[in-house]
Every structure is written in structure tokens, then in C-alpha cells.
Amino acid sequence: MKRILFISPTTSMDNGAEKSIYYLMKYLIQLGHTVINVTHAIGGEPQDKHEQLYKMIGVKNYYLPTVKWWWPDAPGGEILNREEATSYYRQNVQDIAEIIEQNEIDLVISNTVNVFQGAIAASCQKVPHFWLIHEFPKNEFAYYADKIDFIEEYSSELFSVTGELNNFLTPLFNKKVHSFISYTEQETKVLKKGNQVRIVSVGRLTEGKNQLELIKAYKTLNRLDIELVFIGGWDSKYKAICDEYI
């Protein structure tokens, strides 16, 4: 059995990448593997809930303080003090390297291209590293098109979501890009009958998911008796654009 360290992109469960990897961890534990997770510290009740959720499936979490957890040029907040951010990046790599050594990790897996610290730490410790890619290198994630060589060099194996993404990425890499299917456990529930008709959009409000187009389409529907509901987190700048249009 293996001892596997995951690097998570967010300290939340409001996105598909995080949800799918949570259930992958659960499955790996059921197979007898030991799973540990590293993500960034956010503190307070949200972090406590996150930690409890992972404890339920037997995963130990490490929460590392940082200025920005993703690449400097990735979406998700601007870096105001580059020197401070660089210092945290270095510290995060060192901390992950120590976690690898202390826990005798056999494999490091980075979930999404947005986190790179685990790739460097795994290389320092001479431990295999897998990269799971969920994003197309365009629109808000276009920044990582310039990092293809780095991603390839610091990956023992590359994986992307099966289908269009895998077809898109395959010619960009010299190394084979394996495919995987994101998995989420679903509970069957009987829906309550209601009197209100709603259009419901579930998922993080981001430019990549382009909910603004749904809002515009809803406007053309011109049916005030039908509600449009969004459920999930949001990127502040994109939410402001949607709010302004509304």
C-alpha cells in the first residue's frame, strides 16, 4: 500500500476539482492506502469545517499560511508585495518537502495546474509526482500555456479530464497525457413539490463558466414568474461584473 500526498487548490468544496479529488481520496483509503492532504490556511470556521470533512474519511490535513496559494499570475487575487509572496512560496515548498520526508510519502499528486509547490517539493525529495489537470489553457487559465514545459518536466505522469480537454492537451505535451473521469458521490433524494419554477445554476461564479451569458439569456426570456438562482462561491471581480449587469 502507498502513502500518498495530495496538494489541494482550495480549502473548500465549492468546485468540481476539489469535490472529485475528495472522493478519489476516500476511494484510495478504502483500498488501504494512506492519504494526506496539503492546502492553504484560511482560518476560522470554514477551515474547521474543511478539516472535519476530511477527518470523516480518514485524511489528515496540513494547512500552510501563504500570501497566494496559486501561481503568481493565476486568477484568484493579486499579489501586492512580490517579495513577501516569494518568501511564502519558498516556505511552502520547504514545508511540503518536510511533510513528504516525515510521512514517508511514496507519491505526490497536485490537483489542478494552479498549484506547483508540491511538484518542486517532490522533485527535491526524489518522489514521483502526478499532475491532475482540470483546466483548458485559455481564458482565465491561459496563463499556464507558458508553463507547459515546467509542468511536463516536473511530472512523472500527467493526467487530464477525459474528453475534449485531453484531446486539446495531448498535442501540447511530449509526454503522454493520461485521462481520468472526475467522480462525485451523489445521494438520491426525492424532491419536494413547490409552487415556484426556478432555473438553478450550481457552481462557482467565474469567467470560465460564463454565467453572465446565462443572465443575459434569462433577460431575453422575459419571464418574471421564473427565478434564476446561483448556488456556490464566486470570484469577486466576475461577480461584480454580473452584479453590475443585473
Regions found by a protein language model. Name each.
Residues S110-V115, I133:
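Short His-centered aromatic/hydrophobic patch
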